[in-house]
Amino acid sequence: DLHGSAYYCRQLLDCFALEGAERLILLGDLLYHGPRNDLPRDYAPKEVISLLNKMKDRLFCVRGNCDTEVDQMVLDFPIMADYAVFPVEDRLMYVTHGHVFNLDNLPPIQPGDLLLHGHTHVPSWRPFGQQNVYLNPGSVSIPKEGSLRGYMTLEGTLFRWCDLAGTEYHRAALEDLTPWP
């Protein structure tokens, strides 16, 4: 959830480059801060548009509750899907913002599938259902409940949560079903 912060968008893109990642998955709420959030640092949606459009071929995004058709008109990559599905080893990961599909209203997951969403701005990892796992990277711009500004990476079956200095503060492999926090 960037929420229009050019400052944190730049920091996230720096982390993306530092990690040497192939793709950046954004979980919605790209340009607007919404009526329930204070303005994030360096609120500059036009600059965020420019920064993201420059790397459109490496982005994958889903729609957040603050994203609209107007946002899609200025962005050069699709953002309006409610969810997407990615393979993670022998499982499927449902990627969504969290306002439509979440633990209380699941997408069409099967036993063993993963649910990744933002929206709450609180990092999390926990098992549910039949060998399913819920993941949340937290937020780079407006973290909540005392959490750090940060991002999450995936390599193989290992998920890492890092702060914006690139320092890992949590990791979990799909084989590990220990809840956190």
Where does each model-flagged region fall?
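Active-site metal-binding loops of divalent metal-dependent hydrolases
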Residues: 1-4, 29-30, 64-67, 98-100, ...
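Core catalytic region of metal-dependent phosphoesterases/phosphodiesterases
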Residues: 4-88
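Surface-exposed loop/turn and secondary-structure junction residues enriched for glycine/proline
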Residues: 5, 33, 89, 128, ...
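Catalytic phosphate/metal-binding cores of nucleic-acid and nucleotide-processing enzymes, i.e., regions
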Residues: 13-17, 76, 164, 171-173, ...
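Hydrophobic positions in the central parallel beta-sheet of the AAA+
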Residues: 24-26, 94, 115
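Short catalytic-loop micro-motif centered on adjacent basic/acidic residues
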Residues: 61, 94-95
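Conserved beta-sheet core of the metallophosphoesterase superfamily
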Residues: 92, 99-164, 170
